[in-house]
Design a protein with these regions (language model features):
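Extracytoplasmic
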Residues: 1-180
Length: 180
């Protein structure tokens, strides 16, 4: 049995499979998604960790430092911002906090700290990401800046996604791969 299908075989098998009410999650489907390594600005010390995370290039961010991303939305209204980080445990007994700021708004603080072997901890470890969600009641159409800041040590950011369909279920973020 061959390990790879040729184009004709792929076409044949795809024509036989039907997925009703299922549409692919794409960048143009009301989402903007990026790998953390695709930043537009950083305050210093950010290190790309190759082969780590869903992105395979997660970013270790020192305490007090931040990454910023400039985006342009073609929609306005309710949205959610999902931020995915590598699930880690503080080795100093502290917390694992980071903040997210949209434009000049108030920073929203999240904690990744989970009780060892709790359901949240298990889900994060099995997924390979700890995903935190920020509800946005009215994001406007146009240009915005998303800033993610490490408030504690051991913060490793993997990906983020802004989604104008807050109820959407997903597993992977529809990012365009970076060559960085």
């Amino acid at each position: 049995m061959p390990t790879l299908l040729n184009d004709k075989e792929v076409e044949y098998y795809l024509s036989k499979v039907k997925y009703p009410n299922c549409s692919p999650l794409t960048v143009t489907d009301g989402t903007i998604a990026r790998n953390a390594s695709q930043w537009d600005g950083q305050t210093g010390g950010a290190e790309i960790v190759k082969m780590l995370g869903h992105s395979m290039q997660a970013v270790s961010l020192p305490k007090g430092q931040s990454l910023s991303y400039r985006i342009t939305t073609d929609k306005s209204g309710k949205a959610v911002l999902h931020t995915a980080l590598i699930p880690t445990q503080p080795n100093d007994g502290g917390d694992l906090r980071f903040s997210v700021t949209i434009d000049d708004g108030q920073p929203v603080v999240f904690s990744l700290k989970e009780k060892f072997r709790s359901e949240g901890w298990k889900e994060n470890v099995l997924r390979g990401q700890a995903v935190k969600t920020l509800q946005l009641d009215n994001i406007t159409k146009g240009e915005h800046t998303i800033t993610i800041k490490a408030l504690d040590h051991h913060i490793i950011i993997d990906q983020w996604m802004l989604d104008f369909n807050p109820q959407r279920k997903h597993y992977l973020f529809p990012v365009v791969q970076s060559t960085q």
